[in-house]
Amino acid sequence: MASPFSGALQLTDLDDFIAPSQDCIKPMKVDRRPGSGVAKIHIEDDGSYFQVSQDGGMKKLEKAKISLDDCLACSGCVTSAETVLITQQSHEELRKVLGANKTAAPDQQKLVVISVSPQSRASLAVRFQLNPTDTARKLTAFFKKIGAHYVFDTAFSRNFSLLESQREFVRRFRGQADPEQALPVLTSACPGWICYAEKTHGSTLLPHISTARSPQQVMGSLVKDFFAQQQHLTPDKVYHATVMPCYDKKLEASRPDFFSQEHQTRDVDCVITTGEVFKLLEEEGVSLSELEPAPLDSLCSSASAQEPTSHQGGGSGGYLEHVFRHAAQELFGIHVTEVTYRPLRNKDLQEVILEREGQVLLHFAAAYGFRNIQNLVQKLKRGRCPYHYVEVMACPAGCLNGGGQLKAPDMPGKELLQQVERLYGLVRTEAPEDAPGIQELYERWLQGAGSERAGRLLHTSYHAVEKAGSGLSIRW
């Protein structure tokens, strides 16, 4: 069975792209009560299970259920979440919510917001032979046609993610003598990589991982906190779906860290992939190219959008490039006009160096794909990692090549990726600190950069998953 998840989420220590385990081995906690004695299990014709005690009493046993949270917290494997995601995170779930909204009483309806990633937009632009701006406007028209109220671009939330990553690196670099300010800093925007780090090398890797939220989860904060307030709604009255190039983003949205106990709602309620958007279009009998374009939505008036924008530094968000430029200026007073990448063992492993008078001041790298990640981890464990900062992505070639992107049966994968990269690169870029609305939101929404509120809404934490101590494993 082929899996749509990233290599890092499917891995064992042997290969980059292996099929996931067909069996969940989540250990069962056995309830051993004193004096309970021996009991029998009776199976009814309908398949239900009853515990028969020694005195003849019968108690119906609960069905074993594996939730997505169970999967994330399970140390038995680093995969096997597909069956849960089919129901909890799918375009059918989005369709169900949109359908229910149309028939619900006004006070029971939810405000539906859909946030689209630039990578997904580029993939759809190639499929429908559109430019990025027309793709964005026609996607807005389509989602509103099926019941969404607002459609946003996660390039806006990526501004916050990049700025927080810049500040975090400078702080860690200046305080690197402190064991808690560990270098190198490893990016955290890729959930496949984060899942692997937490489950496989927690104590080694987690101190190095950036706490800055990914663009998806920053958008979750923006929509459920800032935008909900602007609409005079509580977060649970807003349904937020995202369109992503990656199946692993479904796991990220389901993390307990991004769930509000107060309002009983997630920052991102549903994640659908680029391919699932294409399925929605097919099911609706709509061709994106034939739709009339609609005006683009913006989160605040000062950031009104006439066209989509993006960032320099490649199709995975540009973390390396933005942090490198900022650090060079902030730490050493050097203005970097052009970032020069030097390929190493392969095209998915590159490095960038800042030198002055022969001295290396900054040493950054980009490591994509599990094999490069594995080599990076081994260097870290041996204390031989020369880098200050590493942009880590589980998918070879990064997010534009994510497992949720559209495939072209009549085009080689390499050629398709080149076309997606070309259209992604056509979008006008801007520095995150210069993006309209960003500084206003830092003051108006977050009470200033570096505030407690900014830390709470723009950062997160990661958790090493302990190996289960129970020897009893159940095949489901």
Curated annotation (Swiss-Prot):
Protein name: Cytosolic iron-sulfur assembly component 3
InterPro entries in the record: Cytosolic_Fe-S_CAF (IPR050340), Fe_hydrogenase (IPR009016), Fe_hydrogenase_lsu_C (IPR004108), Fe_hydrogenase_ssu (IPR003149)
Quaternary data: External component of the CIA complex. In the CIA complex, interacts directly with CIAO1 and MMS19.
UniProt entry tagged with the keyword Nucleotidyltransferase: no
GO annotation, cellular component aspect: cytosolic [4Fe-4S] assembly targeting complex
Keywords, comma-separated and alphabetical: 4Fe-4S, Acetylation, Iron, Iron-sulfur, Metal-binding
The protein's role, per its UniProt record: Component of the cytosolic iron-sulfur protein assembly (CIA) complex, a multiprotein complex that mediates the incorporation of iron-sulfur cluster into extramitochondrial Fe/S proteins. Seems to negatively regulate the level of HIF1A expression, although this effect could be indirect.
Pfam families in the record: Fe_hyd_lg_C (PF02906), Fe_hyd_SSU (PF02256)
UniProt cross-references to SMART domains, sorted A to Z: Fe_hyd_SSU
Binding-site positions, [4Fe-4S] cluster 2: 190, 246, 395, 399
Chain positions recorded as [4Fe-4S] cluster 1 binding sites: 24, 71, 74, 77
Organism: Bos taurus
Similarity field: Belongs to the NARF family.
Cysteines joined through disulfide linkages: none
